[in-house]
Amino acid sequence: MAAAIALRQRGADVLVADALRPPIDKPCGEGLMPDSRRELARLGVNMDDRLGARFSGILFADGDARVRAEFPHGAGIGVRRPVLHHLLLDRATELGVRMAWNAPVVMKEQNAALVGGERCGFRWLVGADGHASRVRAWAGLDAANLRSRRFGFRAHFCIAPWSSYVEIHWGAQGQVYVTPVGPHEICVAAISRRSDVRLKAVIDSIPFLRNKLAGAQVSSAERGALTLTRRLHRVTRGNVALVGDASGSADAITGEGLAMGFRQALLLAESLGQGGLHLYESRHGSILALPQQMATMMLLLDRHAWLRRRALLVLAARPELFRAMLAVHVGEASLPRFLAQHGLQFGALLLAPQFA
């Protein structure tokens, strides 16, 4: 939907076709970082805090090792995915985007497809159909480097948020992300390397969360999804372009999936405004670069409990380092500059005996 909005803002005639019907819900952590909100504003969608729950920063926890930091500027918002989809749908309708729901798409030829059983011609085809993209397969764009693969599960609980942060907790079975999404509701998402683990098992492996959520009513059915770090060799071919998870992704630990999709949508519209897909192909990788680099670093902590605990103890003792890392994460500082200014110090502290 973001791609349709971005293209329509530049005057394109756009048809969105989907086999589902709104409201469309997809499993995710439901936290929009400040940079995500800025990209949404460029699409004409302004997120009122009353639509969800405001959060001021990020907290990491592993047992009694905890560190937190606030965003350098602005705040994030936790919002239920159907609410976000409804806002995007309203914006697309306002702009005059045409829509076909309950309309499966069957690719037929380079400039036409069957949409709900009827032939539909097009000049450009945008595949925004997720990790298992059929458009990607049809266009011969499946070649990719898969760097990580984990399993995610999400549910909502009727309980007032106890924190103004998005909290990431590590346990023996995986990670749990707690995002406030309303005055009396939180989103709880778990990610594990094990396919046989479910949300409750991961929560129960973290005493703090097990105690917090004891007796809390579950307000949504548990849903699952894969989370991948994947880079495609190409994201365009001929008159076909891929956006969102169809075009590659970073592990959900980054919380940047939606922001990347919004940036890609805006870049695609700019590229087609110049008459083709060259700009999109050439710059798409730069949108994925930082989230994938951050995912690599954070997944290293996920793999090695001893390193994770040391890192959290160091960051708790030097909170300015965590603030600087968060600034990099939300695009307000550069990773090379952070490494140049703080890399040696952080490495030395990791080796210091007091953090063993």
Where are these regions (language model features)?
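Generic enzyme active-site microenvironment
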Residues: V16-A17, G127, V243, S249
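Conserved N-terminal helical subregion
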Residues: R38, G52-W138, A144-R150, L350
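Glycine-rich FAD pyrophosphate-binding loop
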Residues: I5-C28
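FAD/FMN-dependent oxidoreductases across multiple families
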Residues: R194-E270, L277-H278
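Conserved FAD-binding catalytic core of PHBH/FMO-like flavoproteins
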Residues: A128-L209
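N-terminal FAD cofactor-binding segment of flavoenzymes
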Residues: D25-L59
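C-terminal helical "tail/cap" subdomain of flavin- and related membrane-associated enzymes
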Residues: E270-A356
